[in-house]
Amino acid sequence: MPDFSIENEISKLINNKHCTIVGVDEVGYGSLAGPVVSAAVFFPKHDNHITYNIQDSKKLTPKKRLEIYNIITPMVKWSIGLAEVHEIDQYNILNATHIAMQRALRGLNSNIDYVIVDGNKVPELPWNAKAVVDGDNISISIAAASIIAKVTRDKLMETLHIQFPQYNWNKNKGYGTKHHLESLHKYGKTIHHRNTFAPASGITKLYNK
């Protein structure tokens, strides 16, 4: 289970028990449709006795994710950043993800001391930062960010599903399930599909109601 070990190590390293250490994670990296969404999360207190079963969002059921989301969002400082489909197509998914992370961090409007990012790459930032491989299984701040980003993006894709029900986005959230791929070939691609991602990149037919 993730805990505050990394956050506490960084606090000791910079000799500041009350520093602002922000965890960052994203969702939607490999999706065929919809934006990439990042969350930035700061816990005012590092108390390992108060974990609320926070863990990598991928290990939680949708019901449990929402339950934890509702518990933690009032008690942490958090912000969301998005990179839209046209930005993913223009800049590539890695750069668009970094843009989403930068937007999430700027949205905190806080004096940030240190940033910990899930993965092996850190976006260009004006703060000290480090990448943490498998960070959503190690750091509570990153795990909380993964939950908030996931719940936020899922809600967004469920809203888009109302307009485009053929693609089943309320269930697959834009990822390449069999049903989604079949619908993509049958109905064509929408404005929410990533043109630089296969198979949308090879489909010329556009969705028309």
From Swiss-Prot:
One of its GO terms (biological process) is mismatch repair. The keyword RNA-binding does not apply. It holds the Pfam family RNase_HII. It is an enzyme of class 3 (hydrolase). The lineage of its organism: Bacteria, Pseudomonadati, Pseudomonadota, Alphaproteobacteria, Rickettsiales. This is Ribonuclease HII. It catalyses: Endonucleolytic cleavage to 5'-phosphomonoester. Its cofactor is Mn(2+); Mg(2+). It comes from Ehrlichia chaffeensis (strain ATCC CRL-10679 / Arkansas). A divalent metal cation binds at D25, E26, D118. One of its GO terms (cellular component) is cytoplasm. The keyword Manganese applies. NCBIfam families: PRK00015.1-3 (NF000595). It comes from the Bacteria. Residues 19-209 form the RNase H type-2 domain. Its EC number is 3.1.26.4. Endonuclease that specifically degrades the RNA of RNA-DNA hybrids. Keywords: Cytoplasm, Endonuclease, Hydrolase, Manganese, Metal-binding, Nuclease. Manganese or magnesium. Binds 1 divalent metal ion per monomer in the absence of substrate. May bind a second metal ion after substrate binding. Belongs to the RNase HII family. GO terms for molecular function: manganese ion binding; RNA binding; RNA-DNA hybrid ribonuclease activity. It is found in: Cytoplasm. Transmembrane segments: none annotated.
